[in-house]
Amino acid sequence: VLTGEDKKHVQHIWGLLSGAEEDLGAEVLYRMFQSYPPTKTYFPHFDVTQGSEQIRGHGKKFMAALGNAVKNVDNLSQALSELSNLHAYNLRVDPVNFKFLSQCLQVALAARLGKEYSPEVHSAVDKFMAAVAAVLAEKYR
């Protein structure tokens, strides 16, 4: 459960990323494809090389969706409803992949933010991403 302090940490970190969302999103996706190669099966039409236009474009969408979740942290189910439907019913993404993406995001944040990504912030981001993953997986039940 996200506490008020957790929400502040997530919102603060998100503010630090302003302007770098596309680069970070591309880095996160590339990390996921490298660390968890089976995730590439959901993107058969993508050029999965580092910095490709497809990775950059989808990374930007990923970060925009997370930005929307950060803004609507108290109502994630409503904020992510369409995305949940898309991933569950149309794309049929295995929910375990949301955890993989979360791990890759956290590695990228730690590498990018250094000391700003304190243990408290890491914990808050982990809880936030777990909440996002849970909402995205709601439609699978």
UniProtKB/Swiss-Prot annotation:
Q: Which SUPFAM superfamilies match?
A: Globin-like
Q: Which UniProt keywords apply?
A: Heme, Iron, Metal-binding, Oxygen transport, Transport
Q: Which Pfam families match?
A: Globin (PF00042)
Where does the record place the Globin domain? 1-141
The UniProt annotation places heme b binding at 58, 87
Write out the GO biological process terms: hydrogen peroxide catabolic process
Q: Which GO terms describe its molecular function?
A: haptoglobin binding; heme binding; iron ion binding; organic acid binding; oxygen binding; oxygen carrier activity; peroxidase activity
* Tissue spec. comment: Red blood cells.
Q: Which InterPro entries does the annotation name? A: Globin, Globin-like_sf, Globin/Proto, Hemoglobin_a-typ, Hemoglobin_oxygen_transport, Hemoglobin_pi
Choose one Gene Ontology CC annotation of this protein and give it: hemoglobin complex
Known function: Involved in oxygen transport from the lung to the various peripheral tissues.
Instruction: Relate the assembly described in the record.
Output: Heterotetramer of two alpha-D chains and two beta chains.
Q: Which family does it belong to?
A: Belongs to the globin family.
* Protein name, UniProt field: Hemoglobin subunit alpha-D
Q: Which organism does this sequence originate in?
A: Turdus merula
Native organism taxonomy = Eukaryota, Metazoa, Chordata, Craniata, Vertebrata
| Gene giving rise to this polypeptide | HBAD
